[in-house]
Design a protein with these regions (language model features):
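Loop-rich non-cytosolic ectodomains and luminal regions
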Residues: 1-300
Length: 300
């Protein structure tokens, strides 16, 4: 809490008591599971209630998997925890703003009658990775997927729950989700697996042809930027809706980053939707200095 340096350096809450919760197990090349996060939050909330103390949870944890509208199970869970006693949850907005991992569009054809095309650049030596497509469940369409070598795969909304295809040297697993009690959005999950050593390098194109459209919007997401290579990204990416989950939960305080040297929002910091000021649940709630921050190091 920054109260041990004889007044020379001081944290933002020097008289706070710290409760440190370690997530997950010691597994090589692994990350904490969502269930482990939920168990850690439950432990912290129960401890605060038992001690009759206020609780501020600092959560610098997030990923890109989900619809990003606050309706997932973990987002709802955080909303419920935030209502217990004197509890506040602060969550970082993530570092996906400039990662090129989000693309969005509508099912409408352009003025020339062409169907929308989303192009994904896959870098050299890319191992397995995934792509999420989120849409309104009531929208029906056909997807044409083109590989870097020009091979074509046509899919429609009547896709089986799970199918497997091979395109060039890439195995493609496609899963079609269903609406949940929390959301009417539907996920189509593409799992790119190398048939030999790596996924085919080059441009993969998703062309979406509308059949019957009511909502009209869709979003593509790649895994967090730490998973694919730096060259794997959408060509026409957008920084909007790049908040990592669970910073999208309604009742948490979402904190982004800005650059104090340029007095601008940090390009890497996750962003929310472009909404009018009168809207509710605008994210992030505020930003704090996040570039070239001075801090302590071991032995200093």
């Amino acid at each position: 809490s920054g109260n041990f340096m004889d007044g020379r350096f001081q944290g933002v809450a020097p008289e706070a008591e710290l409760l440190i919760v370690k997530l997950g197990n010691s597994r090589p090349n692994s990350f904490p599971k969502t269930t482990e996060l939920m168990r850690g939050l439950t432990f912290a909330a129960r401890t605060a209630l038992q001690l009759s103390m206020p609780l501020v949870i600092n959560l610098s944890f997030g990923n890109t998997y989900g619809v990003h509208d606050g309706t997932s199970l973990v987002e709802r869970f955080l909303d419920n925890i935030a209502e217990l006693g004197r509890c506040v949850i602060c969550v970082g907005s993530g570092n996906e703003g400039a990662a090129g991992g989000h693309a969005a569009g509508t099912f409408n054809r352009d003025a020339q009658g062409n169907i929308p095309r989303t192009e994904l650049a896959v870098g050299e030596y890319q191992a397995s990775f995934s792509v999420q497509l989120w849409k309104e469940y009531t929208d029906t369409f056909r997807i044409v997927l083109q590989s870097p070598g020009g091979q074509i795969l046509q899919l429609n909304s009547a896709l089986d729950t799970a199918v497997r295809y091979r395109m060039e040297d890439t195995e493609l697993l496609i899963y079609q989700g269903e609406p949940t009690p929390y959301s009417v959005r539907q996920e189509i999950y593409f799992d790119f697996l190398p048939a030999n050593s790596y996924v085919n390098q080059g441009v993969w194109s998703f062309m979406i042809e509308p059949v019957q459209v009511e909502g009209g919007g869709y979003d593509f997401y790649l895994p967090s930027s730490s998973v694919p290579s730096v060259e794997t990204r959408f060509f026409q990416s957008t920084p909007e809706k790049t908040l990592t989950i669970p910073s999208t939960a309604a009742r948490v305080i979402t904190v982004g980053a800005y650059d104090t040297y340029t007095e601008a929002y940090a390009d890497f910091s996750g962003r929310g939707r472009n909404m009018p000021p009168s809207s509710v649940n605008i994210k992030p709630d505020f930003v704090a200095p996040g570039v070239n921050i001075k801090t302590l190091s071991p032995g200093n």
